[in-house]
Every structure is written in structure tokens, then in C-alpha cells.
From Swiss-Prot:
Gene Ontology biological process terms, A to Z: nitrogen fixation; protein-containing complex assembly
Role noted for this protein: This protein may play a role in the biosynthesis of the prosthetic group of nitrogenase (FeMo cofactor).
PANTHER family: NITROGENASE IRON-MOLYBDENUM COFACTOR BIOSYNTHESIS PROTEIN NIFE (PTHR42956:SF1)
Organism, as annotated: Bradyrhizobium diazoefficiens (strain JCM 10833 / BCRC 13528 / IAM 13628 / NBRC 14792 / USDA 110)
MF GO annotations: nitrogenase activity
Gene name per UniProt: nifE
Keyword annotations of the record: Nitrogen fixation
Protein name stated in the entry: Nitrogenase iron-molybdenum cofactor biosynthesis protein NifE
UniProt cross-references to Pfam families, sorted A to Z: Fer2_BFD (PF04324), Oxidored_nitro (PF00148)
Superkingdom of the source species: Bacteria
Amino acid sequence: MSSLAATVQDIFDEPGCAKNGSKSEAERRNGCTRQLQPGSAAGGCAFDGAKVALQPFTDVAHLVHGPIACEGNSWDNRGAASSGSDLWRTAFTTDLSETDIVFGGEKRLCKAIKEIIDKCDPPAIFVYQTCIPAMIGDDINAVCKAASRRFSKPVIPINSPGFAGSKNLGNKLAGEALLDYVIGTREPDYTTPYDINLIGEYNLSGELWQVKPVLDELGVRILCCISGDGKYREVASSHRARAAMLVCSKSMINVARKMEQRYGIPFFEGSFYGIQDSSESLRQIARLLVERGAPADLLGRTEAVIAREEARAWAAIQPYKPRLEGKRALLMTGGVKSWSVVSALQEAGLELVGTSVKKSTMEDKERIKELMGQDAHMIDDMTAREMYKMLKDAEADIMLSGGKSQFVALKAAVPWVDINQERCHAYMGYAGIVKLVEEIDNSLSSPMWEQLRRPAPWEALAKAREQMQSMAAIAGDPVLAETARRARNICVCNRVDLGTIEDAISVHGLRSVAAVREHTNAAGGCCQGRIEDMLMSEPSDMRQAAE
């Protein structure tokens, strides 16, 4: 069995994965995902997964061995941020041509490694395998080993050709490369009882820096972050940490489990999205560190910091809650965000009508049920047409998703907030939840949406003509006129007509928007103003009878 095939089989037999553990031996041998034919299009491939997992290491030169399109399509597609070197943003590729494919690209790869060292002198070079050199038999493991000896510098092979499998498999192959070639290869300058690793955190839009000040105040040192704002020397010495927090289990569970197995570093899966989840993660970090020998007063200091930060965050989001209360949100993301962001949205007063679980683990789905109830609407896969219909039918007031589906929301004239890795704002930690609530409020309150929903002038003219003709037809028939009035929908969502609301108010003596929602199909969001007007205009004798 080849080295790549053996590594893939080892990943598929991951004991830390609950889904894998529930399978039979034969099912585990078949693997978690169907391997792809070389060159086939299937969204994010294994190479893309490895690249986005490791590229946030800021001082490393990332060299893609393959055609230039592989590097061009994957460059900077994860909005990570750096506090130091910006070498990671420089695109290096061997740019294989037809001649290289015929005669082999190993010499070209060796030449590229030498050129990078001569010009940039990075502490390490990560070399990524792609489909074409893998198919023609280029041995990047041997080339990297020879280059490391020749230049006395770590040259790490990332053997993750795109046809090996999905983007998620590529994340894990990247983790295996770190375990095999990087982690444990050097010692830290010093250690403390408060050293931790953050695994699967990518510092999107610099959101790690919103959590780091809180950890610094507690005296907790991030020995290594894999891989957001990470440095090569930090990940090489990360085996000396006292505890670890796994931020995105789907991508790096193999790294956390094997570091616990090899170096005795306990880990837990947590999240810094939302107030309650941030607090619980801080408590877990403190508990693990105390169990590993840190002073016991860390627990008390952690609770004091949590109380202060929670009070600040709740006070900051309080002004937004009246405007967000009862608004319905559709969350189209995946992985850890499928449940961690749910908690944050609920804290802001939003109602979740559905969350995507396309890239979520069984543990993620169980957490969603804990937060949203056993009947939670978990969306495994939704086409753009289905998403558009759901938004157009006003089943959600706002959608939070990635850039791929933003145009569906815009076409449906529904507010949209970017929640995926391309986003421009940091939503992690106590300050992050406040920023998320602010962005949601800005999107929902924008006057653009009301203008966008208005019909075009020529459509309005045609509609006016139809209405005039209809009014002329029913002008002489009072019964027909009343029927037409009651059949009118009360707002743009078209969920319920005027007569249904009037009957419900009259028969049941309803006095609030919430009561009307309970007895009818009214959404209560976009319909709220019209329902309030109807309640206020109710005849006084009927109001007194209801009271």
C-alpha cells in the first residue's frame, strides 16, 4: 500500500470520530468518503483542504507543486490575519508545463525550493502535492527529504492531491503532515504551567486577537495556534503544551487525539462564538490546566473575568434586542459554526428556522438538538432553488451564510450577513458577539431592502391598471367588494389574508401580536406593524367585551 493510501486509510479509521466508531470493520475500510477521479470537479478537493488548513502559518513559504491554476484558485481564499510576517500571502508554484508532465517535475520542484530559500530564507517550506504530479509519479517526499539535507532547512511534503478525496480529508492530511514532520522537532524557549494549544483555529479576520487579551489577563499562554497567526517554531514545539482546545473537530480531530496519545496533552472541543460558549470554554481551559499542575487560584480568577466580560457583552447587545426579537434567521454554514453560531444568535433574540449540517459531525448535530430542540430543522443539503423559495416565501427574515449563497438572498431581496471564512468582521469572543449582533441589525434595518422589494415603475403601472379594472368590476357589488377586501394579504410575505386576521381577533378576543401569531399563519415580523394597526382600530365595544 502506498504512503498516501496508508495515510488515508489511517485517517478513515479515526477513533476520535464518533461516526466512524459506530461503523463496522468493513464500513471503516471503505472510508468516509468516495475517492474522486483525477480531474473531476467536486467542490473543495483534498489539496484545497490542506492548503486552507496550513496557509495561515504566517512565516512559512507555501509552495504548490502543480499547474498554476491550482495555486491561483486556492490563493488567499481563507481570510486569516497575521501579526507578523506576510510571507504566507506570497504565492509560490512550480507552474508545471506540458514538458514537465512528459519528463517529470522533480527537478523543477528542487529548483523552486532553492530559489525560495535564496530569495526569502523562510524558517520552513511546505510543499503541496496536486493531482497532475501525483499521477505522473513525482515523489515529493524524496525531493523534500533531499532538499532538507542539502539546504539544512525543514522542507515539509504535504501529500494531498485533489483526487484523494474531499476538502475535509485534505484538512486531516495536512494535520498528519504536521504530526509526522513538524510537531515535536524542537523545544520551546521556556514553558509555563499555563501553556495551551488552540487546534483548528484560523484567526479569520483577526478574531483570535479578540480572545487572546482575555487569556493574557488570566496568565494563559497560547503556546501554539494551529494554524491561525501561527509560526513554524511554535508548532514545532507545541508538544510541550499542558492542555489543548479543539475549535473545529471535523478538520483536526486527528491532530488533537494523536497529540494526547503521544505527548499526554488532554483536549476538549469548545467554541468562542457567543457569550455562554465563550465562558464555558474559558472554564474548561482553566480546569484542564489546574488538573495538569497550574495553581488552583486560576479557577477563581477565571470566574471573575467571565462575570465581568458577560456583564459588558449583555449590556452592549441589549439595545439591539427589541429590534431583533422574533426575527427569523436561516443559518447556511457548516462544521462547528452549525451549532456555535446558533447559540450566539439565540442570545441576540433571533429565532432559528434552520441550520446547515452538511459538514457537521454527529456531535455537532447533538449540540444543535440541545440548543434548538429535538425537532430542529437541520439541512443536510439544499439547492439554490430550494433556498430561494424558502426566502421568497418569507420563512426567514435574514440569512447568514458564505459568499456562494449570497446572491440567492439578494435575488430574494432578503437581508444577508457573511458568516463564513471570507468575512470581513471578527465574531469570536465577547466582543465578537456584539459585532455580530450589530451587523445583523444593520442588515435588517437597512432601507435598501424595502426599496428593493418595490416593483419596477412599469410593473407598478401594469398592476395599477389591473387594480382599476378590478375595482370597476366590483364597484356595483358590495358583497364582492367586501370579499375582495378580506382576501387581501396583510403584507409582502403573503402568509395570511386580512379576513383571517379580523376573524381571529373578533372570535378569540386577541389583544397582542403574539396571540395573533399563535392563532394564524402570520409571521409577526414583517406583518407586525399591520397587525398592531388592526388591533388598535378594533371597535371599542368589542375591545371591552374581550376584556
